């Protein structure tokens, strides 16, 4: 099991950049393939060739019959299946590592350019180019890469390859061995002189192990297909949301264009009034007419005598300007 440690660490890093279904697939891969294959596989299939016996004494007949019965050992076939199925995942991990390193280099270069005191147009163009490149690399708040853009394409391709390889190895196992281990294998191959019966050790235990690995392979294939469906639905939902945002009408008072043509009402300042002027009275303007009316009213008020006058205040001396009593009487009469 020590030989699988490095591969386990690599696949553990892939789990940080996978979907929920992908994490379940990796769990099935670790527990039901690596552990079971490492712990129980060698003990079950360790006596595969040593206990394979045939009822003949012909030299070399047992070896050729074993080669015909098992073109490749089950345990080695499953190890090969595990390596091939894990290869697309490792390719995806390589893409993740490449994008992470690239994002780090871009951030470092951006910091160096922003630290420059002078604002050179070439520096501004370089910063704009770096921002465009970083926009293509979607990074989450926790520092992990989001599965979008080119990374999404690599992830979908890896899942497709895993599905094809899984189905291919299941078909190959069925063509080579079938789904059960027969206790007796009949062999007729040179240099065997006749039909030879060969006997397999612990066929029932090996049949159970074969069925178990078959079920694990089917579960892995189903998980890959579910992940493909999940990724397809995810891409479709993103496309629908993006289309809805594009087709949504702008809010009142806003415009989708930065400088849309708008119509404004205004009053012309250089032209004369469009309506005719108000008519004047007696050829005078309104202000002159009001002033004439006010003057006429004042003249009438000054010529009109008051009906009642209060008696003047009694003082110690007689006012020289007071009119005589006869004049007052005449005025009131």
UniProtKB/Swiss-Prot annotation:
UniProt-annotated stretches for the region Disordered: 303-333
Membrane side Cytoplasmic: residue ranges: 1-20, 100-148, 231-333
Listed GO MF terms: gap junction channel activity
Record field: compositional bias (Low complexity): 317-333
One GO term describing the cellular component: connexin complex
Keyword Secreted: no
Top-level division of the source organism's lineage: Eukaryota
Database matches in InterPro entries: Connexin, Connexin37, Connexin_CCC, Connexin_CS, Connexin_N, Connexin_N_sf
Keywords: Cell junction, Cell membrane, Gap junction, Membrane, Transmembrane, Transmembrane helix
UniProt-annotated location(s): Cell membrane; Cell junction, Gap junction
Keyword Transmembrane helix belongs to the record: yes
Membrane topology: Multi-pass membrane protein
Entry's transmembrane regions: 21-40, 77-99, 149-165, 208-230
Intervals, Extracellular compartment: 41-76, 166-207
Family affiliation: Belongs to the connexin family. Alpha-type (group II) subfamily.
Annotated function: One gap junction consists of a cluster of closely packed pairs of transmembrane channels, the connexons, through which materials of low MW diffuse from one cell to a neighboring cell.
Subunit structure: A connexon is composed of a hexamer of connexins.
Descriptive protein name: Gap junction alpha-4 protein
Native source species: Bos taurus (Bovine)
Phylogenetic placement of the source organism: Eukaryota, Metazoa, Chordata, Craniata, Vertebrata
Gene from which the chain derives: GJA4
């Amino acid at each position: 099991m020590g030989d699988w440690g490095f591969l386990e660490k690599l696949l553990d890093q892939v789990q940080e950049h996978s979907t929920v279904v992908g994490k379940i697939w990796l769990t099935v891969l670790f527990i039901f393939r690596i552990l079971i294959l490492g712990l129980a596989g060698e003990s079950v299939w360790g006596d595969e060739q040593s206990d394979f016996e045939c009822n003949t004494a012909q030299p070399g007949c047992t070896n050729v019959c074993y080669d015909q019965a098992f073109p490749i050992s089950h345990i080695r076939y499953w190890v090969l299946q595990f390596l091939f199925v894990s290869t697309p995942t490792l390719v995806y991990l390589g893409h993740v590592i490449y994008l992470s390193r690239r994002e780090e280099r871009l951030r470092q270069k951006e910091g160096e350019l922003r630290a420059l005191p002078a604002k050179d147009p070439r520096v501004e163009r370089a910063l704009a180019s770096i921002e465009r490149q970083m926009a293509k690399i979607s990074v989450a708040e926790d520092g992990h890469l989001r599965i979008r853009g080119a990374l999404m394409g690599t992830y979908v391709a890896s899942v497709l390859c895993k599905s094809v390889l899984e189905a291919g190895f299941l078909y190959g196992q069925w063509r080579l061995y079938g789904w059960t281990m027969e206790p007796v294998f009949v062999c007729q191959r040179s240099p065997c002189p006749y039909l030879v019966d060969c006997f397999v050790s612990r066929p029932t235990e090996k049949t159970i192990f074969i069925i178990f690995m078959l079920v694990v392979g089917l579960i892995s294939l189903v998980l890959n297909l579910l992940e493909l469906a999940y990724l397809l639905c995810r891409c479709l939902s993103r496309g629908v949301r993006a289309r809805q945002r594009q087709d949504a009408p702008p809010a009142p008072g806003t415009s989708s264009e930065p400088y849309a043509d708008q119509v404004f009402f205004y009053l012309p300042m250089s032209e004369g009034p469009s309506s005719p002027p108000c008519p004047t009275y007696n050829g005078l303007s309104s202000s002159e007419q009001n002033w004439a009316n006010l003057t006429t009213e004042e003249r009438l008020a000054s010529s009109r005598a008051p009906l009642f006058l209060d008696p003047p205040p009694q003082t110690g001396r007689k006012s020289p300007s007071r009119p005589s009593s006869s004049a007052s009487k005449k005025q009131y009469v």
